[in-house]
């Protein structure tokens, strides 16, 4: 009997602060995916491995977000599952190593000084501020963010763009998921692969994995109907099932 692998793009999936996601919401997500797996593959698998990907490390330190996710996930007891007198083992893991490697990929959540320059959509800008840009918040913000060295124009204020604004970015997470999708799909004992993500950067890797192993049951759960409609046709060409997932 084979395995079903579930790859969940955690930060991409949930909106707002991850810290506000409840344990019950996590459980509902896992349960919905597992039910889909068993409906299609109950006779092909005996084990389900759920892997959660995200920017879990800032430097070499586990982030507060990662600790919160780990704590809540560890309290969810779904396995083993008994259905029609058959037992399905499994696990749910917050992962920081890719399949086939033992090293942890650190520094997957990075802070960068400043915010990229904003562009104004002229079609949606009202003409009322055209002659008074100096008091229009849209133009003030756009001008302040033009360069990272920009200083506040208020007399006596020395606030600098790059010192007051910063952004956080995930690094390597998409690449790690793509590597795992390709690697897992090549394993003989993996009967089904389920990817839960709205990130279109993963789609080429999903497609080539299915081409290399057409026998694997490949499934993609996306958050938005818009993503589903935009990519359903091309993914169905490769016999990849795509559906919207209610959270």
Residue ranges and their predicted role:
Residues 1-150, 161-167, 211-212, 221-223:
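Domain-level signal for Mg2+-assisted phosphodiester chemistry and nucleotide/NA-binding surfaces
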Residues 120-247:
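Nuclease catalytic cores that cleave nucleic-acid phosphodiester bonds
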């Amino acid at each position: 009997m084979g395995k079903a692998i579930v790859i969940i793009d955690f930060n991409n999936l949930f909106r707002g602060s991850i810290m506000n996601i409840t344990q019950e919401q996590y459980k509902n997500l896992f349960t919905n995916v597992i039910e889909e797996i068993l409906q299609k593959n109950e006779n092909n698998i005996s084990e389900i491995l759920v892997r959660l990907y995200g920017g879990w490390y800032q430097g070499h330190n586990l982030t507060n977000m990662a600790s919160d996710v780990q704590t809540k996930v560890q309290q969810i007891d779904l396995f083993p599952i008994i259905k029609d007198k058959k037992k399905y083992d499994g696990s749910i893991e917050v992962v920081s190593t890719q399949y086939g490697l033992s090293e942890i990929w650190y520094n997957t959540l990075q802070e960068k000084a400043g915010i990229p320059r904003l562009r104004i959509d002229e079609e949606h800008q009202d003409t009322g501020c055209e002659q008074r840009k100096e008091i229009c918040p849209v133009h003030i913000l756009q001008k302040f963010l033009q360069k990272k060295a920009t200083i506040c124009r208020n007399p006596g204020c020395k606030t600098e763009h790059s010192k007051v604004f910063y952004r956080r970015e995930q690094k390597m997470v998409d690449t790690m998921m793509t590597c795992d999708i390709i690697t897992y799909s090549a394993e003989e004992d993996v009967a089904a692969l389920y990817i839960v993500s709205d990130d279109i950067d993963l789609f080429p890797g999903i497609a080539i994995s299915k081409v290399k192993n057409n026998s694997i049951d490949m499934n993609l759960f996306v958050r938005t109907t818009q993503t589903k409609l935009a990519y359903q046709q091309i993914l169905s060409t490769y016999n990849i099932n795509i559906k919207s997932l209610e959270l």
